[in-house]
Design a protein with these regions (language model features):
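N-terminal Lys/Arg-rich, disordered targeting/topogenic segments
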Residues: 1-10
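Metalloprotease/metallohydrolase-associated module, dominated by Zn2+-dependent proteases
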Residues: 2, 24, 28-32, 117-140, ...
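Disordered inhibitory propeptide/activation segment of secreted metzincin zinc metalloprotease zymogens
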Residues: 12-60, 69-70, 74, 108-125
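Short, structured coil/loop segments at alpha-helix boundaries
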Residues: 54-62, 87, 141, 176-179
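Metzincin-family zinc-dependent endopeptidase catalytic domain
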Residues: 62-148, 152, 156
Length: 180
């Protein structure tokens, strides 16, 4: 009987510990999601400006990206440099720390109505890498590169007409301000 009580007691301790861990994880994850939803810029790069790599391909417009980078530079968000023709071995890498990588998407990577999508990797509140995936040809649309670089810099959507970070393309504009 003593061995059974010991096993039963260990089982209760294990379940209580597991329950506490799951509860703590859930509360932490919920707090992180709430922070992301409520913040205009929940994450940012550290003091080293990111490097932008064109892994989309040679048909990506260098002029369009340079214009988009300039849009953010005049607002105080810097890029280390832009590499229009990086080596293929670099483009084969995923989640390169310190880089914003531009890629051509395929029909499985983007929803039907999505022109481009930016994914950020973070450590704490610091962005470590970002990847912008474009629907083929959408990089030529006015302001799309500026908008996606905004996400790569850590900004979320702002549902105010004329704002560069508006989620709907037809309501996007050249304006940038931090919402109240």
């Amino acid at each position: 009987m003593g061995a059974r009580k010991k096993i039963h007691s260990r089982g209760k301790t294990f379940l209580a510990t597991l329950g506490s861990l799951l509860l703590g994880f859930s509360v932490g994850l919920g707090g992180k999601i709430l922070y992301e939803v409520k913040s205009f810029q929940p994450y940012s790069w550290d003091d080293n400006p990111p490097i932008v790599l064109n892994c989309y391909g040679e048909d990506f417009s260098e002029l369009q990206m340079v214009r988009a980078i300039d849009y953010w530079v005049v607002r105080g968000y810097n890029i280390g440099f832009y590499e229009h023709n990086p080596p293929p071995t670099v483009c084969e890498q995923k989640d390169l720390m310190g880089f914003i990588i531009l890629r051509k998407g395929n029909h499985r990577q983007l929803d039907e109505s999505t022109l481009a999508s930016t994914k950020r990797k973070t450590f704490g509140l610091v962005i470590t890498s970002a990847e912008i995936i474009y629907r083929p040809g959408s990089f030529n649309l006015d302001l799309i590169n500026e908008h996606e670089l905004g996400h790569a810099f850590g900004f979320n959507h702002v549902e105010e007409a004329g704002h560069i970070m508006h989620p709907l393309y037809h309501k996007m504009g050249k304006g940038f301000w931090k919402p109240e």
